[in-house]
């Protein structure tokens, strides 16, 4: 009947509206996360807030992460890095086909950018102590170098990080929020607003 058809049309329209508001096709891509005090932004290079980290961990990734048993597992890399016999050089292979939310594919240049940004004096990163054993980090922090001497890009998916001295916790440290990887283009474009904007 025409009444049952009209009711079906109303139900269909309500379902479509509900689908859009619940994240269906055509919905805005917004993450809402309740937090009493989120700290001073989501850029974990410039923040030490555990509250900010709890949010940042929902939208950014480091090369490794800790599982529920506090064991590390690869996230953005295919496996744990191989380490040279002298304990100085770590060789990484990125997973292929990983994309940032802006659609760009993760490559070695984004990882290099992230670590170099950390040691750039203008960033005023609070997390450098976790990584300042990387060769050339101290020179960048002092402003006498603009590139990280210990970071070598092999190709889009392979890179090496060389340390000044053996440092056993290095692999653990790259699994923290302080080593979340940023897309170079988007981060550069956002400038000082990185981690603050909507």
Task: Name each model feature, range by range.
Residues 1, 5, 33, 63, ...:
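Residue-level signal for nonpolar/aromatic packing positions in well-ordered secondary structure
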Residues 54, 58, 62, 71, ...:
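Extracytoplasmic/secreted proteins, especially bacterial periplasmic and envelope-associated proteins
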Residues 1-30, 189-190:
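Short, low-complexity disordered leader/linker segments with a strong preference
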Residues 79-130, 160:
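Aromatic- and charge-enriched surface segment that lines or borders ligand/interaction sites
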Residues 26-30, 58, 75-77, 85-89, ...:
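Extracytoplasmic
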Residues 64, 68, 85, 99, ...:
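Sec-exported extracytoplasmic/periplasmic mature domains
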Residues 163-198:
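Gly/Pro-rich hinge or "lid" segments in bacterial periplasmic/extracellular proteins
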Residues 34-85:
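N-terminal lobe/hinge region of extracytoplasmic solute-binding protein
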């Amino acid at each position: 009947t025409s009444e049952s058809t009209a009711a079906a049309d109303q139900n269909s329209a309500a379902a479509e509206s509900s689908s859009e508001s619940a994240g269906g096709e055509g919905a805005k891509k917004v993450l809402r996360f309740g937090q009493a005090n989120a700290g001073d932004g989501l850029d974990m290079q410039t923040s030490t807030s555990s509250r900010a980290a709890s949010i940042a961990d929902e939208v950014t990734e480091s090369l490794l992460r800790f599982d529920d048993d506090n064991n590390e597992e690869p996230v953005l890399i295919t496996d744990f890095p191989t380490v040279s016999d002298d304990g100085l050089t770590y060789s990484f292979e990125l997973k292929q086909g990983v994309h940032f939310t802006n659609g760009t594919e993760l490559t070695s240049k984004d990882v290099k950018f992230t670590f170099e940004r950390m040691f750039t004096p203008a960033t005023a990163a609070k997390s450098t102590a976790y990584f300042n054993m990387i060769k050339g980090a101290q020179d960048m922090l002092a402003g006498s170098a603009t590139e990280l001497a210990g970071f070598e890009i092999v190709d889009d998916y392979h890179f090496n990080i060389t340390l000044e001295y053996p440092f056993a916790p290095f692999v653990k440290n790259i699994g923290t929020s302080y080593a979340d990887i940023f897309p170079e283009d988007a981060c550069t474009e956002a400038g000082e607003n990185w981690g603050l904007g909507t």
